[in-house]
Amino acid sequence: MLYPAITEAIRHNKRICLATPRADVVQELYPRLKEVFPNTEMEALYGGTGGDRTGVGQLIIATTHQLIRYQNAFDLLIIDELDAFPFHHDPLLHQFAVRSAKKYATKIYLTATPRPKQKRLIESNKLKAIFVPIRFHGYPLPVPRLRLELGLKRKISQNKMLHSLEAFLDSHDPKRQWLLFVPTIQLLTPFAKLLEEKGLDLATVHADDPKRKEKITAYREGKINVLITTTILERGVTFPSIDVVMIDAGHDVFDEAAIVQIAGRAGRSPKDPTGDVLLIHQGKTEAMIQAVKQIKRMNQKGKAL
């Protein structure tokens, strides 16, 4: 979707920055863009990249924190995952972004889940928006299935297997990969133990995991069948053929945007465009209801195209 704009900017010898809040996304985008634009001077900037980065390439792929390096530098500034943490919550990062662009720069903001502020700007015609309700492969977004688990929190506290998760395992193709989202770091190990007892090949991952990159790579290469994760993998990573299960979907950490993003991890491949999304909960929340409505609404708009 961005390639035409980047291609045009490169053709006119303009400087481009594709910024995103998360280092994982920078690491994923850089090789893809390098393959598409092999003759363009390009650099990836994120925390821990070392002192050998000059930051002077024509095309910069960077975390939004790295924009502090620049002032009046870019003719085209693209902010991916506009609503993601930490960019969404930090006014200083917004200032860095504005300062990094030239006065008459073109700015493109990308998000699948605009926040109320962006929605108001769009509705009042203060922010031009193009709505893309369908994926590149033309198939609808997977609609989450909601499953009530009575005594969910009690079972979690007692490290007991959930009936809904057991039913999922019984019906699930054991060769098929899936992601298990839990609301807190503290739940990673208990659920890992429960699933290891079922003989599953798995790993856990969270934001401060020093082996996060290696585990994600192993999962992408099919060496791990199940990845148990916090919301760190709710966005910005692409796995071709997976299903998704969310534990305690009514937890505060799973707001409407998070649920939509997590559901969006499934069905990303044209060879496997459906995917299963299961939300295990102790009671429906407004976030769950609105997320399902939003996904169905997007699918309806996609059908109309």
What do the predicted segments below correspond to?
Residues 72-150, 160-163:
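Post-DEXD/H (motif II) to motif III coupling segment of the RecA-like Helicase ATP-binding lobe
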Residues 41-56, 202-230:
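Conserved helicase ATPase core of P-loop NTP-dependent helicases/translocases
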Residues 81-86, 209, 216, 220-225, ...:
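Conserved RecA-like helicase motor core of SF1/SF2 enzymes
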Residues 14-15, 41, 55-59, 73-76, ...:
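Loop/turn-to-beta-strand initiation segments
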Residues 1-6:
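Motif I (Walker A/P-loop) of helicase-class P-loop NTPases
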Residues 101-117, 263-294:
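Conserved segment of the helicase C-terminal RecA-like domain
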Residues 14-16, 20-64, 202:
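Conserved nucleic-acid-binding Ia/Ib motif block in the N-terminal RecA-like helicase ATPase lobe
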